[in-house]
Amino acid sequence: MSNNFDHTMQFDFSKNKEDLTKSILTDVYNSLKEKGYNPVNQLVGYLISGDPTYITNYNGARALVRKLERDEILEEVIKSYLEIK
């Protein structure tokens, strides 16, 4: 780490946010699947409606998914689908 205080440091947290979103969606997906739900349908229902009851409470999945904004989830899903970085 430099001791040069004449330059502004930049911090890019977009990769961390992407990793967090993927981790949360994976955990939620697995929890929904374990409970016998169709995870894709349930996640779509949540993303469209904003109603968290589409997501099971099992393994804290509902609380996890609510840590993310729905628009942020959609942004990451679309970027991943289109393979955009």
From Swiss-Prot:
It comes from the Bacteria. InterPro entries: IreB. HAMAP family: UPF0297. It comes from Clostridium perfringens (strain 13 / Type A). This is UPF0297 protein CPE1779. Belongs to the UPF0297 family. Pfam families: IreB.
